């Protein structure tokens, strides 16, 4: 890929698989993530591939294509240390990590802590919003949860809310516009973001830019590059009881949300272009 009918192409920046497979003499990698199902997710419930000969061949071919294409890059960057670590572990390559600000940087604001914890993201199993919903059964009755986003798990999550009798306390908001997203961050007590081994996770940065503490899990990956337990949020085991205990502490400790949120802002305020 060197030109199109309108203009020459002097630089190609690959981000996700398979974009970085494109061949170009001036190719740079800005790695968001690889095809994780044939790397770190292989052998977990989050991969579609098993140990059959056919699956093993697919894994081999994808990894072979990756290493060829990645070695063609003149410079390697990764979106977070977690993504860079996988590149080192599986491909033997080193990448620099300049953290990118979220798309709405400069527009986030803060407000007084509200009566809800906020979550945002795709409703799928790796984002683990079911964990937040189950944790609400362990949290004070006056605390609510509001979750923005859509995805394949929405119906299952709605069913879980009904099963646990949390219809009045947990709300799935679906897709929302930017202004409402900013408002929901600003008005929250804190932000839940505990996916499984996330590459980076803009939500953590968005929460801290809104001066809100983040509740994450010990196996959440990227968020752990920013969240320090008891300093700007909570890092807990991925269990309903542990998340519920963090929610309870946040909801019942006067001034804690503001203190942790302020420390979070200090942690990410320098992430700019």
Residue ranges of model-derived segments:
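Membrane-proximal helix-turn-helix segments that form the acceptor-binding/catalytic region
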Residues: 47-76, 84
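Conserved donor-binding/catalytic core segment of Leloir-type glycosyltransferases
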Residues: 107-127, 131-140, 146
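Nucleotide-activated donor-binding/catalytic signature segment of Leloir-type glycosyltransferases, i.e.
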Residues: 158-176
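Short alpha-helical donor nucleotide-sugar binding micro-motif in glycosyltransferases
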Residues: 175-176, 183-188
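Aromatic "clamp/platform" in nucleotide-sugar-dependent glycosyltransferases that forms part
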Residues: 196
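Short hydrophobic beta-strand element within catalytic cores of glycosyltransferases
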Residues: 213-217, 227
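Conserved acidic donor-binding segment of nucleotide-sugar-dependent glycosyltransferases
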Residues: 229-240, 249-254
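A short, well-ordered alpha-helix in the C-terminal region of glycosyltransferases
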Residues: 249, 256-270
């Amino acid at each position: 890929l060197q030109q199109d009918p309108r203009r020459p192409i002097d630089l190609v920046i690959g981000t996700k698989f398979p974009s970085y497979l494109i061949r170009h003499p001036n190719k740079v990698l800005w790695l968001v993530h690889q095809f994780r199902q044939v790397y770190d997710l292989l052998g977990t419930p989050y991969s579609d591939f098993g140990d059959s000969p056919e699956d093993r061949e697919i894994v081999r071919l994808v990894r072979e294509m990756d290493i060829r294409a990645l070695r063609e890059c003149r410079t390697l960057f990764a979106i977070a240390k977690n993504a860079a670590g996988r590149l080192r572990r599986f491909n033997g390559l080193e990448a620099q990590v300049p953290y990118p600000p979220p798309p709405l940087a400069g527009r986030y604001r803060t407000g007084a802590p509200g009566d809800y914890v906020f979550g945002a993201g795709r409703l799928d199993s790796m984002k683990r919003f079911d964990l937040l919903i189950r944790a609400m059964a362990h949290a004070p009755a006056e605390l609510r949860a509001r979750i923005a986003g859509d995805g394949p798990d929405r119906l299952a999550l709605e069913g879980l809310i009904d099963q646990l009798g949390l219809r009045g306390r947990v709300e799935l908001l679906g897709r929302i516009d930017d202004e409402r997203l900013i408002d929901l961050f600003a008005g929250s007590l804190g932000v839940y973001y505990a996916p499984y081994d996330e590459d980076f996770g803009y939500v953590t940065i968005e929460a801290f830019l809104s001066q809100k503490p983040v509740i994450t899990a010990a196996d959440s990956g990227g968020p752990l590059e920013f969240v320090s337990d008891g300093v700007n949020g909570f890092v807990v085991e991925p269990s309903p009881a542990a998340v519920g205990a963090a929610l309870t502490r946040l909801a019942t400790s006067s001034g804690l949300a503001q203190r942790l949120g302020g420390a979070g802002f200090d942690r990410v305020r320098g992430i700019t272009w």
